[in-house]
Amino acid sequence: METSGMTNASEKPSEKHAETHEGGCFCGSVRYAIEGAPTYMGNCHCRDCQRAIGASFVTWIGAKPENFVVTKGEIATCETSPGVHRGFCRRCGSSLTFTGDDWTDVAITAASLDDTSFVKPESNVYLDHRQPWVIIDEGLRCYDKLP
């Protein structure tokens, strides 16, 4: 198991952003802040996310790495497939982040945010793996794989 290379509070960017969102794990051992608007919001239905999160799908929001700041504790990570790292709280196991060698952003689990009222997914990906009981909002962009 590794610890994440995410920015720590002491390395917080000096530029103030108009928008800040905070969140953390279930037990409160890990806290984070996202400065600025998310780069994307979407639902992933892939089997890896289903198994890692323990749900039918996960809603991710993206942030530039320099705008994602761990303000308390440390996010532990494990490499779940080559070049893919999932971040979680070492104490309670809450899933928090997803990073990949081929990804420029940090993906954060939307459900770990303190306030989710601004979250509006734009797409569904990996619909070829969706669970049969999940009803899909056809108003969102829908893809069987990643676009």
Briefly describe each language-model feature range.
Residues 2-147:
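A short Gly-Trp-Pro
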